[in-house]
């Protein structure tokens, strides 16, 4: 029975944790794609408040080497910010849900920032200046409105972002996440970013494992499932999710990564 069949037929989707532990016997045939917030790192009240456990960058770097470099971060964060989080380790990254990407060979692809979009971001900051707890995050070619500290503002903020999307035009799309609404380039999604990596060495020819925690990760779940890979969600199983398995928490995933990184294989 294949690992994928086991995940699909298991009564407890938490079998994903056992599967990742089994990677140690077949690292040469897998590629690993990891979301950051809520997946590698615990969610925080604001984007800048996330804490990176001191040992995590080195654990990821060791695991990447065991995978022959076939480990990439796929995140809503921008490339530069993601690099700061895991410095001095350096990985292929798809940022802004795929609007930015650094290939394994170091080439960087970025969406263009326009003057009109810069003005729109400034208007969003001004419109929410008196909304205590609401945070507008400038991501360059994307903008996110966070309401984790102001949940009562959700409806108003969603309406404001729909207005902003109309102003931005057809080249942009709205993305909902955990206590956040984001406007990003319409052509960008995590599924396409994973597919692009899988067309390049060292990812090419390997089966993909995608791990995420949010609706923003569903696109990469669908992509890896379609390609015969495995999708794993952080948190309790959710019937509406495309994920084939689950791991209870970001802390549990970090423990698995640390264990894999330490194996003498």
From Swiss-Prot:
This is Probable trehalose-phosphate phosphatase. GO terms for molecular function: metal ion binding; trehalose-phosphatase activity. It is an enzyme of class 3 (hydrolase). Substrate binds at residues 35-37. Coiled coil: none annotated. CDD domains: HAD_TPP (cd01627). Mg(2+) binds at residues 35, 37, 213. The lineage of its organism: Bacteria, Pseudomonadati, Pseudomonadota, Alphaproteobacteria, Hyphomicrobiales. Keywords: Hydrolase, Magnesium, Metal-binding, Plasmid. Removes the phosphate from trehalose 6-phosphate to produce free trehalose. It comes from Sinorhizobium fredii (strain NBRC 101917 / NGR234). Pfam families: Trehalose_PPase. Its cofactor is Mg(2+). The keyword Ribonucleoprotein does not apply. Its EC number is 3.1.3.12. It catalyses: alpha,alpha-trehalose 6-phosphate + H2O = alpha,alpha-trehalose + phosphate. The active site is at residue 35. One of its GO terms (biological process) is trehalose biosynthetic process. Pathway: Glycan biosynthesis; trehalose biosynthesis. Belongs to the trehalose phosphatase family.
């Amino acid at each position: 029975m294949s690992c994928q069949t086991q995940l699909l037929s298991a009564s407890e989707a938490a079998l994903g944790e056992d599967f990742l532990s089994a990677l140690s016997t077949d690292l040469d045939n897998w590629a690993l794609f990891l979301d950051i917030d809520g997946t590698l790192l615990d969610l925080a009240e604001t984007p800048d408040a996330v804490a990176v456990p001191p040992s995590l960058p080195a654990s990821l770097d060791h695991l990447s080497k065991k995978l022959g470099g076939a480990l990439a971060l796929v995140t809503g964060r921008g490339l530069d910010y993601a690099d700061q989080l895991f410095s001095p380790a350096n990985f292929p990254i798809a940022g802004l849900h795929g609007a930015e990407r650094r290939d394994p060979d170091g080439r960087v692809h970025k969406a263009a920032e326009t003057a009109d979009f810069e003005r729109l971001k400034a208007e969003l900051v001004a419109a929410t200046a008196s909304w205590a707890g609401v945070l507008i995050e400038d991501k360059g070619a994307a903008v996110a409105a966070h309401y984790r500290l102001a949940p009562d503002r959700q409806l108003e903020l969603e309406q404001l972002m729909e207005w902003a999307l109309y102003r931005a035009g057809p080249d942009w799309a709205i993305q909902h996440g955990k206590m956040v609404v984001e406007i990003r380039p319409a052509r960008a999604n995590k599924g396409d970013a994973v597919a692009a990596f899988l067309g390049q060495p060292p990812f090419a020819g390997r089966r993909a494992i995608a791990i995420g925690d949010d609706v923003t990760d569903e696109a990469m779940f669908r992509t890896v499932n379609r390609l015969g890979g495995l999708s794993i969600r952080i948190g309790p199983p959710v019937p509406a999710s495309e994920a084939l398995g689950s791991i209870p928490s970001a802390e549990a995933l970090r423990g698995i990564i640390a264990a894999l990184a330490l194996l003498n294989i």
